[in-house]
UniProtKB/Swiss-Prot annotation:
It comes from Escherichia coli O1:K1 / APEC. PANTHER family: TRANS-ACONITATE 2-METHYLTRANSFERASE, TRANS-ACONITATE 2-METHYLTRANSFERASE-RELATED. HAMAP family: Tran_acon_Me_trans. It is an enzyme of class 2 (transferase). Belongs to the methyltransferase superfamily. Tam family. GO terms for biological process: methylation. Catalyzes the S-adenosylmethionine monomethyl esterification of trans-aconitate. It catalyses: trans-aconitate + S-adenosyl-L-methionine = (E)-3-(methoxycarbonyl)pent-2-enedioate + S-adenosyl-L-homocysteine. This is Trans-aconitate 2-methyltransferase. Gene3D superfamilies: S-adenosyl-L-methionine-dependent methyltransferases, Vaccinia Virus protein VP39. It is found in: Cytoplasm.
Length: 252
């Protein structure tokens, strides 16, 4: 599990794309020229950006070779670059940096966010959406199973928090619009929840385990999910999924 699995990731494409659509709707920019899609994945968000600004020069950035290959296949006329978000440098100032469900994987947001703002043109916008589910049962149980089975902690860090991001970006010279939304996804089974998180949040926990260790982990994880997520009257499961949204406009 050294690289992302585009097919597994796309299994819930509609649910994953909805936050990108809603983030994009809050970006009030017109006639812009340079856009970067950070953590572009399979190119779903890049396609949305092209629809909104067809004349703009858009660059999709992702560190996953598999994701970049999928994006290039889906959008052959677009520019995609395999690179680390932290190290990538654009050739010109950017009018929009769009980062949908990517920056949560990177550490040191107190340094990362001001760095990204520095890449913007005057009045440019940094638009960010990050899953804020570190305290949700899906992610708490990952840590509990790992502790039970004596596996090292592989999970990502929790987000800095609403007030911290507001201060970070305000001090970086931005006007900040920040909000948090909880989606309730209808899941047909507990296995469907596992399928969802295996493509994203569960990846770091499984990547260094043998096949038998992975199966042992997932069996116990499934048992614990059944305890935490009861069935609705119609047999569905409601999976709460909080997400943090930020639209920061550079004022300098």
């Amino acid at each position: 599990m050294s690289d992302w699995n585009p097919s597994l990731y796309l299994h819930f494409a509609a649910e994953r794309s909805r936050p990108a659509v809603e983030l994009l709707a809050r970006v009030s920019l017109e006639n812009i020229e340079y856009i970067a899609d950070l953590g572009c994945g399979t190119g779903n968000s890049t396609a949305l950006l092209h629809q909104r600004w067809p004349a703009a020069r858009i660059t999709g950035i992702d560190s996953s070779p598999a994701m970049i290959a999928e994006a290039r296949s889906a959008l052959p006329d677009s520019l995609f670059v395999e690179a680390d978000i932290r190290n990538w440098q654009p050739e010109q100032a950017l009018d929009l940096i769009f980062a949908n469900a990517s920056l949560q994987w990177l550490p040191d947001h107190y340094e990362l966010f001001p760095h990204l703002v520095s890449l913007l043109s005057p009045l440019g916008v940094l638009a960010v959406q990050m899953p804020d589910n570190w305290l949700e049962p899906t992610h708490v149980l990952m840590r509990e199973v790992a502790w039970e089975q004596n596996y090292p902690d592989r999970g990502r860090e929790p987000l800095a928090g609403v007030h911290a991001y507001y201060d970070i970006l305000s001090e970086a010279g931005c006007e900040v619009d920040i909000w948090r939304t909880t989606y309730y996804h209808q899941m047909p089974s507990h296995q469907a929840i596992i399928d969802w998180v295996t493509a994203t949040g569960l990846r770091p926990w499984l990547q260094d385990l043998t096949e038998s260790e992975q199966q042992h982990f997932l069996t116990r994880y499934h048992q614990m999910l059944e305890e935490q997520y009861p069935l609705q009257e119609n047999g569905q499961i409601l999976l709460a999924f909080p997400r943090l949204f930020i639209v920061a406009r550079r004022t300098e």
